[in-house]
């Protein structure tokens, strides 16, 4: 069920951190963050059927001070969290654990690892593997990782083929349901803004790196 391409659910509290799993008392993203951090919310986490894993970020992702960006902003992915190293994934259905093996491979946020949070001030080393607890319910995957002791990050992921995105249009924000299909397997069918609907068909085969960013 994990096989495929996933993205962060474009909604409030898709990313949150607190003293327990599923808790966002310390911080959680807002709806506005979905737009501000669009370079993060369009990142793909790809679980291939052959057991390989890919972080597909395109030209930009969200960078934090520990990665050299102060203040936080969109920027070019920084190694080793740029998908440049080969990685694999393994899912233990009995325990619900998902393990990524490969330097820099991650889900959600690269700074959250099992030993703690990566930082510019005395961070733990970047690990060769990271383990998350995954819960699958419908088309939603909820991931939890405890960073060190008592710090829990929770992420909500949805299949990349179907995502709800907040799209600026004029002076208003509309919630637009976007049915997204990889171009090399068929047409993209987009429902439109507010009462306007349209579809876009592209017959040119393209890879996931060349996907349309909304």
Model feature map: region roles:
Residues 1-25, 29, 94-101, 145-147, ...:
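Beta-rich carbohydrate-recognition modules and glycan-binding surfaces
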Residues 12-17, 32-139:
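Contiguous, well-ordered beta-strand patches that form the walls/edges
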Residues 128-160:
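C-terminal or internal capping secondary-structure element at the end of a domain, subdomain, or sheet
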